[in-house]
Structure formats: C-alpha cells, structure tokens
Amino acid sequence: MFENMDFSKMGELLTKAQEKANELEQEALKKEFSAKSGGGLVKVSANGKGEIIDINIDDSLLEDKESMQILLIAAINDVMKMVEQNKKSMASNLFSGMGVL
C-alpha cells in the first residue's frame, strides 16, 4: 500500500497544503454569494466562509411574519448550498493542484 510513497517529502507536502489552505480561506472571505426567495422579496448574502453578511426584506413582508420566516429560511438554505458547493470546489482544487488526487 505504501510501497511507492516517499515519506521524506510528507512534511513539505503538508506545509504546502497548509499554505494553500490559508490562501483559499482568504479568497473565501472575499467571495460573496446571494440567494433570493419569493421573487426577490427576500435576499440573503453570505461570504465564502458561510457567514451571513446581509439580509434584505421587502417592506411588503413586514406585516406577514409567517411568510417572511418561510422566505428567509428558503433564501438562507439556498445561499448556504452555494457556499458549501464553493467549499467543495476549493477543496478539490487544493488537492488536485498538489497532485494528491
């Protein structure tokens, strides 16, 4: 199983992986993802780390708490899916760029 592995380069590989991971984390903070629900009545934005950075709610929803909650949940779930997909893509790029995959 480990016959062809050069363990002397393992430390170097791990150092490169950590450096690349740090770069990707900084890139993620700069990225912004947005999702809308209710035909644009609710818009939620998150950065690449998955932190919600903005929420916009149309004034017409302020009197309808239940609809607002449903639309907020939908928009938050959608934007989190975008962030998660981006994280998977970045992880794949990290490993493929190092020749691990």
From Swiss-Prot:
NCBIfam families: DNA_YbaB_EbfC. Belongs to the YbaB/EbfC family. GO terms for molecular function: DNA binding. Disulfide bonds: none annotated. It comes from the Bacteria. Homodimer. Binds to DNA and alters its conformation. May be involved in regulation of gene expression, nucleoid organization and DNA protection. InterPro entries: YbaB-like_sf, YbaB/EbfC. Pfam families: YbaB_DNA_bd. GO terms for cellular component: bacterial nucleoid; cytosol. Keywords: Cytoplasm, DNA-binding. Its main location: cytoplasm. It is found in: Cytoplasm, Nucleoid. This is Nucleoid-associated protein Cla_0113. It comes from Campylobacter lari (strain RM2100 / D67 / ATCC BAA-1060).
